[in-house]
Amino acid sequence: MQVTVEATGELERRLTITLPGSDFESKVQERLRSMVPRIKMDGFRPGKVPYKVVERRYGSAVRQEVSDEFVRDSFRDAIKQESLRPAGMPQIEPPQLEAGESFAYTVTFEVLPEIESVKLEGIKIKQPRAEVTDKDIEGVLKKLQEQHIEWEPMERPAQEADGVTITYHGSIEGKPFPGGSKENFFVILGKGTTLKEFEEHLIGVNKGQELTFEITFPEHYGNQELAGKKASFAVKVISVTAPRLPEINEDFAEKLGVKEGGVAALRQEIKASMTRNLEQAVRDRVREQIMDGLLVANPTTLPISLVKEETSILLEQAKNNLAKQGVNPQEISLDESPFVEQARRRVALRLIFSTILEKQEIKADQDKIKQRVTELAASYEDPEEFSRWIFSDRERLSEIENAVMETQIIDWVLDQVEVLDKSMSFEEVVNPQISSAKEKVQD
């Protein structure tokens, strides 16, 4: 086998692979002769069809079949011989199959960039230091109260923050319009869930009151068919209710699933959950900083084919997410450009991580894999069944192994770089938007 390698770009390679034509022809004849005993054809006894007849009938298909095998096997041997690492699918120009000539073909593909070593210079990690305080717990309790608000009927006029249940019928120029009528529609005044002008007409209404008013839809209203148009609404007020926060007591704790221990046990569960969230948020922040640092310290040319492949995956995920929300992806055209940068980031990190795994000889820690599965199983009704489900499927287990190896890579980098403690509050750690805004103010 003769192999010539041509660099047609920074990462693109063009291979010309030549094999003796006699080897190809011999393999074709061998394949055809092996078929003769099995061939049944009108006018001939089973297994007695002449070779020439078999060749005439099946020769073309067999030559293509053998050609595919020669290409597959020789390409594999060629990249091994030339120490090449293909990235993405190769583009193969069909070989010439003329009898008696050499079996030659060309294949074009990108190779993975050579990263001799992963640089860590300049990477500094700010590791958050925070704890769950009583104030944080009180904040969660407050949110839980708000999530379980009880609405108390009122005989007074509706005011800001009240809940008003109404039935309304809307029309434009005397004609009903799609979505313009609702029965028993509940709206919290001042919450902003409906048009502000619509809500303003409900301030001061009483139970049983009927009223008619007009509003003008905003010019940039979501439904363009209604944007800028004036609509008339006939409204009947079914009820006016005021929000009442439930007391934080044993009944409230039971309602949240705490059967024993009352409020004290509820606080303990909240703190334990918040602590887990805090620990995960710290890991996520450190992980993101390490990834950002690795990308800055190790710029590299990326294979276009891998970036395109990753972009397609992200685009497909976006379509699936839309489908879950009830949107038909076929009815909209998603632009792939917003996904390209994310795809480039993923491909670059995959190459860097792969180099670290290879150079540092990092293997998936089996104890950590078992620990990870146990942690995931803890949230299921039957943890043992979940664990068996994970370990019984190679693909599912592979996902766990990859996650564990990524953690091992992060831990290795963390041991090599400068780590600075940064005091933060619980909210700043778990809500990046808060800390980001605070940093901008300080800057």
UniProtKB/Swiss-Prot annotation:
GO BP terms: 'de novo' cotranslational protein folding; cell division; chaperone-mediated protein folding; protein transport; protein unfolding
Gene: tig
Compartments where found: Cytoplasm
Task of the protein: Involved in protein export. Acts as a chaperone by maintaining the newly synthesized protein in an open conformation. Functions as a peptidyl-prolyl cis-trans isomerase.
Primary location recorded for the protein, binned into one broad class: cytoplasm
Recorded family membership: Belongs to the FKBP-type PPIase family. Tig subfamily.
Keyword annotations of the record: Cell cycle, Cell division, Chaperone, Cytoplasm, Isomerase, Rotamase
Enzyme class: isomerase
PROSITE patterns: FKBP_PPIASE
Record's protein name: Trigger factor
UniProt-listed PANTHER family: TRIGGER FACTOR CHAPERONE AND PEPTIDYL-PROLYL CIS/TRANS ISOMERASE, TRIGGER FACTOR-LIKE PROTEIN TIG, CHLOROPLASTIC
Domain text: Consists of 3 domains; the N-terminus binds the ribosome, the middle domain has PPIase activity, while the C-terminus has intrinsic chaperone activity on its own.
NCBIfam families, alphabetized: tig
GO molecular function, one term: protein folding chaperone
Superkingdom per UniProt: Bacteria
Reaction equations catalysed: [protein]-peptidylproline (omega=180) = [protein]-peptidylproline (omega=0)
Pfam families given in the database record: FKBP_C, Trigger_C, Trigger_N
